[in-house]
């Protein structure tokens, strides 16, 4: 019995002995009875016979009466102890215990969270009216009142007296005027200066204990060392005595109860000798025989690599070496016939162990395995030597330390002046600092400013108050008449009433041509005008003096010369959309023609009629124009109205000549600031300024940590601090680099170790019987030819072979008319290639095919190939068609506030307003406060068009060109139309066997056969001989092109690739596309012919018809590049081809017009509750300015104030806003060179880009470096020469049991097997013809996940190599972050006209316009009210039969959206949602239903609500679980958040099928078949249950398609949290159906541990099936 099989219970059968009873006949001696009445028996009486055999037992008699009760028997002997009884059944539940004592009162609970704010209370009642307030303070004087209406005309003054005439006598002062009315209260004063800071307040009391924080996150999985085994515990106390009930069975099947325990018996007789005792402890020196091997233990966990042992003693001389090098590899043999189908294997840990095979040859060295888990802690090492280590990488910046003590005073070191630095780029504008101290007031007057531009006209002032009445005038009797100087021009008169419009005047004379304007944007082409009459050019008129009368209009002049190019006109309105023209012929794209000569100028159109007057424009005020030339004096105006009579004036002397220049006047007021100067040269560096105040922190993310600063000077020793708290244990560190290899130690033999603890007693093995030596085996028959070795590397392409003999040409049937092809260009004759050498004849293959050998182990990975040369740059692709619109993106985060934009360009010049009448100068007012920001102006008219040129009409066809040079080799053409299928040729001789093909995909199930009667299992038959070849069938007719195929099912998992290192191999050559053949119709299934023998080769047949298109050949070598041909003739237009393949994406179009400002985004979700702020934290940064308030109503106009006196000097005002950045000032004077104080340490800078390689450094010092790490394993060396024979070694110890002998000879072939199952799907047919382009298909399913690659050894970074060759230009990157502001550029060109300003004051009402044209159709109106109920309609037609839809979900377990299986349609796609856990309770989704496919992903897809009508989202320790993808987690296993989660979440598709879908599970590693009448949708692994946090989870119904996942993963789902993170956690488990051996159904399961790589062999397989529609 094998040691691995469980012992079976043996049943002892007691044989029954059947005794045949023979009756012995009695001996008769001479007694004859003749008659019935007389018998004469003479002779003596015989002796008594022997006792006969007992007769057979009689039938049992009737049951007797119960006998009387017997006397009690004597006390029996003491019985043997009985066997332990069976375990009794579970007892009845006990009575509930008494209630326990009351517990001690609990500790007081922590204070609860602060409750939410209560609802707004009901408004209170209005209060009672208050008492009368105190009278207010008297107001300030009001402004002067509005001047009253003009009074009545005064009385005429008294006549002047004739006596005492005085000239220039001044009248008496008038009476004081009446006091004005009360003025309005004055404006509030300016705010006072900022007061000094108050004294610091006292420290506050400690705050109340904060609320209890939310439940913490799940802890990280810490992988520690496994602890050492504990010491065996002490022996426990003795258990309670067991009760033994012994039932004695007496004779007559009566049950006697056992009596009381008897007295102790007397000493018994000495017993027989006992069995031999256990062997005693051996104190001798001999070693016992080796015991039998024990049972196989569980596979242990991988151990830790031990420390390297000390160097061993030099070994003895080795045995002679192996055979020499292997010979050259033989040629590849013929492929063997396919083997029989093997039996289904089950993964069973309990299979019996077979005979041990012969040891195989040592395999090649495997790839380096993954790093094992950490071993137990090693022996403490010897103390290491202390050497200073290399400088570590800069650490992260630490927390800000407390302020240090005041440093020692520094030394006054005078540094040498530095060389002047270059001008730095202007820095970013700093944030505004605090207000500075008030500056000194200097009354120095500045130099006079430049002449300012003329100011705008002031608004008319208010008429002044009437002056006092004048003195009566003097009577002038004999005054000489001297005319006074001409008076000032009078005020313009009031506007007259609008006159009647005059008739249309005659056309004026044509003006002289203007100076050419700037080149304008091209306008839209105008419509051609009608031909005008040519006019004669008139003479240029002279400038008439303004006194002349307007002459009669002259005759039209002669036609003038065409004027210079005028300014561009305003773009015309777009014309009406024209009718579509006739469809043009499809032209071949011609070469771009040369630019034609400029066309003749068109004839000028006649002037159109004058349009109606437009409304006055509301343009903004334009920039002031250039100063005009002096105008001609105007015509004399109409005589003014008589002015009031002037007072009599004495003759004024005529003004004399100008006097000498006067003394210099007082300095004038400070002029306006001048125009900024040009940029000065780079000045000398200024002195370092003092430290500025810390600015307001800007809006930005914290920068990366800066590099480590230089070491500071050592500070003074601080005072001793308080002892700190015990720190938290740190996170486990990353494994350190391997240490330097130690020096070999001197090996000393160690002393005897301490005796170990006694081990646990092992299971006793069974003793096997010593077998007899076996007979020597028969010599084996020679083995069959081995199978092919692995496919070799592709060889170099050989030279082209010689030209074969010409084939025989038989005319085939005429093909159908092909489509006319395009005219090809005539190529030049190529050069003749060289003839290659004739190949050697091949070695003839053997007649017999070998049996297939076992799959060889994978070979040693080849050397890493070098990177291939860069390919030539491809031709640019055609622009692609526009892809479908992408899905709406997620709302982005709110952007940061932008910087202040530059000032806008000046507006368009406005039309000049009408001149106002001059007002009386008003009183100078005080400077007003800045007004509120006005409302946004209306949207401007559209700007000038950006269409750079208009497409002209189609040109005439060009002249015939010259013949072109032959063109370069074109791109690969589109596959041609499929040819007709040729007749099938006679079978050729057998070709050489091809390489082993890939495993085909599973074929579709055949039509169901009739249900056969199950036969009994026959014996295995002998393999039959090969049958004859069947006759050829007739070729089927060519089928029509098939529809595009659906996506194929997912192929089998590929073999694992070899690790090739990190560099990719060179790209293989591209194969030529094969010609697609026609897809034939499906032929009828032929009757299976009997298998025939391979007949002899027949005579050579007649040449066959042309064969079907061959398989695609290997790519031929590239030909030499031909010369570029001359341009060919333009061919006739071809027939319109089928639609082309989609091109590459087109280049981005020009930037569109900026769209309107979008609406505000949806408010984002509320953020998490922040942590409690620090006590006495510094004030936060300054907030952004608030939103602009609504514009207030316009106030009533104020009254003018009296001119005030000059006020006292006010306090210093607050600092104004930062102005626009000025131009750089002129270079300053050179400063004194005094070293400034060292500034505070700057913030850490961002990491710089790597610099260019530096110059070679100086030679290093000759210092012996530290011993380097052990190098990686080298390639195995060639086999060495045999060594010399060694000395004879001492006799060895008793060896271990030897390996089993070589395998015996190959057995006879078995009996004929059962017929195999239906074969797999055949090779795919030839390609069908190209169908019309289908719609853009869905994204294909992802490929099967490959086996995990080998572990890459991450090496430390080496020193930077020399700069590589420049790479190909990369793809366009995403826009980078905004850079710092650049230097101030030069002044730009004059800007375009600005947008329209605010509308001016409304003009007079215009005349009624004409009726407008019909407008565009308006937008759809809102839904109307529901109409009245209609009449009952006619009865409808009978309903059509509709298919019932059954919905299921398919999960890809990758980031690709899965496709629906054939015969089903997708409804929508989403993300694979597994289950949620809320309030420590889990609820899951069936993965086969549409509830497991959510269309939006979030780490917290649910919220919870309570009875208070309050809902909380993402604010508790709840979880959600999603199916994951095979994407690898980061090395540090940090949680993933944000956009980085996308590659980890599985995608899914909800599909609708015509019938229900179920899952079938095999509980073996074989994929189960679908039931009869069902079709397969997909195959997978049986997934049953999952649990995670708190051991909560749910499961899948095994009938649901969700229980059959297409990929197996030990961790198939991610755990996500409300805080936005996801990760894999160690307490997440997945449960799968196991693979079972049917022979072990009712046996105890054997515990086993299966490691990665073997997992898929123990998982049950399954298949999802859907019922067919008949």
Curated annotation (Swiss-Prot):
Motif (Cell attachment site): 791-793, 996-998, 1154-1156, 1306-1308, 1345-1347, 1432-1434
One cellular component (GO) term of this entry: basement membrane
Pfam families attached to this UniProt entry: C4, Collagen
Ranges for region Epitope recognized by Goodpasture antibodies: 1427-1444
Region feature Required for the anti-angiogenic activity of tumstatin, mapped onto this chain: 1479-1557
Gene Ontology BP annotations: cell adhesion; cell surface receptor signaling pathway; collagen-activated tyrosine kinase receptor signaling pathway; endothelial cell apoptotic process; glomerular basement membrane development; negative regulation of angiogenesis; negative regulation of cell population proliferation; negative regulation of vascular endothelial cell proliferation
Record annotation: effect of changing residue 1661 to C: In ATS3A and ATS3B; likely pathogenic
Residues bearing attached sugar chains per UniProt: 253
Major location (coarse): secreted
Residues covered by region (Triple-helical region): 43-1438
Covalent cross-link site, S-Lysyl-methionine sulfilimine (Lys-Met) (interchain with M-1533): 1651
Site (Cleavage): 1426-1427
Superkingdom of source: Eukaryota
The Collagen IV NC1 domain, residue ranges: 1445-1669
Listed GO MF terms: extracellular matrix structural constituent conferring tensile strength; integrin binding; metalloendopeptidase inhibitor activity; structural molecule activity
Similarity comment: Belongs to the type IV collagen family.
Record text about domains: Alpha chains of type IV collagen have a non-collagenous domain (NC1) at their C-terminus, frequent interruptions of the G-X-Y repeats in the long central triple-helical domain (which may cause flexibility in the triple helix), and a short N-terminal triple-helical 7S domain.
Protein name listed in UniProt: Collagen alpha-3(IV) chain
Taxonomic lineage: Eukaryota, Metazoa, Chordata, Craniata, Vertebrata
């Amino acid at each position: 019995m094998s040691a691995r099989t469980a012992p079976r219970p043996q049943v002892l059968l007691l044989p029954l002995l059947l005794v045949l009873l023979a009756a012995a006949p009695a001996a008769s001696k001479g007694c004859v009875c003749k008659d019935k009445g007389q018998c004469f028996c003479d002779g003596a009486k015989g002796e008594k016979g022997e006792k006969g055999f007992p007769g057979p037992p009689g039938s049992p008699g009737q049951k007797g009466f119960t006998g009387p009760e017997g006397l009690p028997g004597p006390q029996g002997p003491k019985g043997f102890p009985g066997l332990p009884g069976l375990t009794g059944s579970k007892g009845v539940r006990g009575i509930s215990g008494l209630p326990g004592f009351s517990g001690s009162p609990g500790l007081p609970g922590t204070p609860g969270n602060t409750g939410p704010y209560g609802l707004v209370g009901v408004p209170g009642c209005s209060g009672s009216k208050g008492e009368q307030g105190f009278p207010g303070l008297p107001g300030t004087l009001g402004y002067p009142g509005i001047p009253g209406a003009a009074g009545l005309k005064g009385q005429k003054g008294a006549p002047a007296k004739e006596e005492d005439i005085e000239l220039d006598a001044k009248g008496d002062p008038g009476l004081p005027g009446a006091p004005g009315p009360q003025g309005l209260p004055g404006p509030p004063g300016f705010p006072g200066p900022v007061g000094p800071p108050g004294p610091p307040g006292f420290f506050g009391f400690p705050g109340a204990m904060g609320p209890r924080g939310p439940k913490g996150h799940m802890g990280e999985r810490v992988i520690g060392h496994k602890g050492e085994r504990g010491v065996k515990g002490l022996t426990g106390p003795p258990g309670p005595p067991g009760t033994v009930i012994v039932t004695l069975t007496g004779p007559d099947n009566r049950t006697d109860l056992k009596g009381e325990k008897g007295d102790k018996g007397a000493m018994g007789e000495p017993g027989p000798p006992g069995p031999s005792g256990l062997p005693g402890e051996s104190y001798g020196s001999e070693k016992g025989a080796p015991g039998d091997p024990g049972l196989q233990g569980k596979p242990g966990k991988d151990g830790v690599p031990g420390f390297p042992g000390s160097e061993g003693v030099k070994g003895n001389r080795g045995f002679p070496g192996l055979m020499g090098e292997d010979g050259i590899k033989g040629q590849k043999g013929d492929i063997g016939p396919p083997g029989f189908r093997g039996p289904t294997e089950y993964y069973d840990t309990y299979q019996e162990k077979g005979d041990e095979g012969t040891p195989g040859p040592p395999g090649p060295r495997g790839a380096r395995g993954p790093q094992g888990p950490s071993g137990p802690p090693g022996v403490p090492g010897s103390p290491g030597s202390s050497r200073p280590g290399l400088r570590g990488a800069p650490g992260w910046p630490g927390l800000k330390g407390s302020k240090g003590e005041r440093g020692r005073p520094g030394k006054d070191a005078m540094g040498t002046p530095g060389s002047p630095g270059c001008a730095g780029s202007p820095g970013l504008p700093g944030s505004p600092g605090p207000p500075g101290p008030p500056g000194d007031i200097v009354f120095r007057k500045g130099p006079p400013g430049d002449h300012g531009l003329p100011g705008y006209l002031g608004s008319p002032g208010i008429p002044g108050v009437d002056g006092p009445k004048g003195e009566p005038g003097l009577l002038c009797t004999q005054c000489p008449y001297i005319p006074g100087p001409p008076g000032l021009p009078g005020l313009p008169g009031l506007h007259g009433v609008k006159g009647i419009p005059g008739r249309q005047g005659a056309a004026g004379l044509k003006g002289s041509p203007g100076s050419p304007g700037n080149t304008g944007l091209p306008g839209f082409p105008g419509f051609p005008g009608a031909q005008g009459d040519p006019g004669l050019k008139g003479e240029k008129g002279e400038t008439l003096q303004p006194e002349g009368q307007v002459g009669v209009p002259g005759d039209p002049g002669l036609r003038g010369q065409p004027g210079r190019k005028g300014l561009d006109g305003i773009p015309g309105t777009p014309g009406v959309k024209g009718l579509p023209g006739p469809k043009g012929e499809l032209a071949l794209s011609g070469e771009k023609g040369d630019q034609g000569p400029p066309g003749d100028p068109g004839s000028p159109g006649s002037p159109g009629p004058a349009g109606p007057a437009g409304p006055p424009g509301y343009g903004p005020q334009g920039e002031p124009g250039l100063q005009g030339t002096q105008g001609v004096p105007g015509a004399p105006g109409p005589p003014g109205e008589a002015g009031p009579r002037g007072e009599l004036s004495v003759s004024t002397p005529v003004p004399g000549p100008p006097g000498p220049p006067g003394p210099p006047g007082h300095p004038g007021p400070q002029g306006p600031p001048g125009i900024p100067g040009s940029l000065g040269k780079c000045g000398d560096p200024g002195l370092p300024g003092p430290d500025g105040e810390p600015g307001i922190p800007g809006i930005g993310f914290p920068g990366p940590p800066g590099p480590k600063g230089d070491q500071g000077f050592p500070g003074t020793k601080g005072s001793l601090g308080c002892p700190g708290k015990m720190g938290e244990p740190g996170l486990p560190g990353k494994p350190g680099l391997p240490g330097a290899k130690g020096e070999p130690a001197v090996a000393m033999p160690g002393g005897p170790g301490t005796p170990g603890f006694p081990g646990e007693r092992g299971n006793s093995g069974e003793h096997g019987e010593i077998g007899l030596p076996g007979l020597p085996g028969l010599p084996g028959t020679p083995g069959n030819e081995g199978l092919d070795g692995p496919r070799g590397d592709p060889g170099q392409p050989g030279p082209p072979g010689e030209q074969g003999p010409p084939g025989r040409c038989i005319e085939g049937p005429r093909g159908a008319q092909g489509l006319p092809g395009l005219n090809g260009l005539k190529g030049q004759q190529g050069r003749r290639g060289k003839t290659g050498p004739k190949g050697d004849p091949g070695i003839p293959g053997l007649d017999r095919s070998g049996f297939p050998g076992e799959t060889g182990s994978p070979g040693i990975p080849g050397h890493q190939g070098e990177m291939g040369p860069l390919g030539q740059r491809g031709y640019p692709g055609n622009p692609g068609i526009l892809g479908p619109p992408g899905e709406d993106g997620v709302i982005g985060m709110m952007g940061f506030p932008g910087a202040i934009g530059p000032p806008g360009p000046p507006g368009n010049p406005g039309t000049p307003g009408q001149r106002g009448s001059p007002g009386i100068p008003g009183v100078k007012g005080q400077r007003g406060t800045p007004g509120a920001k006005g409302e946004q102006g209306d949207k401007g008219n559209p700007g000038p068009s950006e269409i750079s040129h208009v497409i002209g009409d189609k040109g005439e066809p060009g002249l015939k060109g010259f013949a072109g040079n032959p063109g370069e080799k074109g791109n690969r053409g589109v596959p041609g139309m499929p040819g007709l299928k040729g007749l099938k040729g006679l079978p050729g001789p057998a070709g050489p066997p091809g390489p082993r093909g890939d495993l085909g995909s599973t074929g579709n199930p055949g039509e169901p056969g009739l249900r056969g009667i199950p036969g009994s299992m026959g014996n295995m038959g002998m393999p039959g001989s090969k049958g004859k070849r069947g006759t050829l069938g007739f070729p089927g007719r060519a089928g029509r092109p098939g529809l595009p195929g659906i996506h194929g099912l997912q192929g089998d998992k590929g073999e694992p690739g070899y690790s090739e290192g990190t560099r990719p191999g060179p790209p293989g050559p591209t194969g030529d596309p094969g010609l697609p053949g026609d897809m034939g119709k499906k032929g009828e299934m032929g009757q299976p012919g009997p298998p025939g023998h391979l007949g002899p080769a027949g005579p050579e047949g007649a040449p066959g018809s042309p064969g079907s298109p061959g398989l695609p050949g290997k790519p031929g070598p590239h030909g030499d590049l031909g010369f570029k041909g001359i341009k060919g003739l333009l061919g006739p237009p071809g027939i319109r081809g089928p639609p082309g393949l989609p091109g590459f994406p087109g280049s981005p179009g020009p930037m569109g017009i900026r769209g309107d400002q979008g609406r505000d985004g949806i408010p984002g979700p509320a953020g998490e509750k922040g942590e409690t702020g620090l006590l006495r934290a510094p004030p936060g940064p300054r907030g952004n300015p608030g939103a602009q308030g609504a514009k207030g109503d316009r106030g009533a106009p104020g009254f003018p104030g009296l001119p005030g006196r000059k006020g006292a000097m006010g306090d210093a005002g607050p600092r104004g806003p930062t102005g626009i950045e000025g131009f750089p000032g002129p270079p300053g004077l050179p400063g004194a060179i005094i070293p400034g104080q060292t500034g505070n340490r700057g913030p850490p800078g961002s990491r710089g880009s790597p610099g260019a390689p530096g110059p070679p450094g100086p030679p290093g010092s000759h210092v012996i470096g530290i011993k380097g790490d052990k190098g990686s394993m080298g390639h195995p060396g060639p086999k060495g020469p045999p060594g010399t024979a060694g000395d004879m070694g001492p006799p060895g110890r008793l060896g271990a049991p030897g390996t089993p002998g070589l395998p015996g000879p190959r057995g006879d072939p078995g009996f004929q097997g059962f017929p195999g199952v239906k074969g797999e799907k055949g090779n795919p047919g030839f390609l069908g013809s190209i169908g019309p382009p289908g719609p853009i298909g869905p994204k294909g399913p992802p490929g099967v996940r490959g086996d995990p690659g080998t572990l890459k050894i991450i090496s430390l970074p080496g020193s930077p190599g020399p700069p590589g060759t420049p790479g190909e230009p990369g793809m366009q990157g995403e826009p980078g972050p905004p850079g710092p502001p650049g230097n101030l550029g030069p002044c730009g060109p004059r800007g375009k006209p600005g947008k329209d300003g605010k509308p001016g004051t409304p003009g007079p009402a215009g005349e009624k316009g004409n009726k407008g044209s019909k407008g565009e159709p308006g937008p759809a109106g809102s839904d109307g009210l529901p109409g009245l109920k209609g009449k009952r309609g006619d009865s409808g037609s009978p309903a059509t039969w509709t298919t019932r839809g059954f919905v299921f979900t398919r999960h890809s377990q990758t980031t690709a959206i899965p496709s629906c299986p054939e015969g089903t349609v997708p409804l929508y796609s989403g993300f694979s949602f597994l289950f949620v856990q809320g309030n420590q309770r889990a609820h899951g989704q069936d993965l086969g239903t549409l509830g497991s496919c959510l269309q939006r992903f979030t780490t917290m897809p649910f919220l919870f609500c309570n009875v208070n009508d309050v809902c909380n989202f993402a604010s508790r320790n709840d979880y959600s679980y999603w199916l994951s993808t095979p994407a690898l987690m980061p090395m540090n296993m940090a949680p993933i958040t944000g956009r980085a989660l996308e590659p980890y979440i599985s995608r899914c598709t909800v599909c609708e099928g015509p019938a229900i879908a179920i899952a079938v599970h095999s509980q073996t590693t074989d994929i189960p078949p679908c039931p009869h009448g069902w079709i397969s949708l997909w195959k997978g692994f049986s997934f049953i249950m999952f649990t995670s946090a708190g051991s909560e989870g749910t499961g899948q119904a095994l009938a649901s398609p969700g229980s059959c996942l297409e990929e197996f993963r030990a961790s198939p789902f991610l755990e996500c949290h409300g805080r936005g993170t996801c990760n894999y956690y160690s307490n997440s488990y997945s449960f799968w159906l196991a693979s079972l051996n049917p022979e072990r159904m009712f046996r105890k399961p054997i515990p086993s541990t299966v490691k990665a790589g073997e997992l898929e062999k123990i998982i049950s397989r399954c298949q999802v099936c859907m019922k067919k529609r008949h």
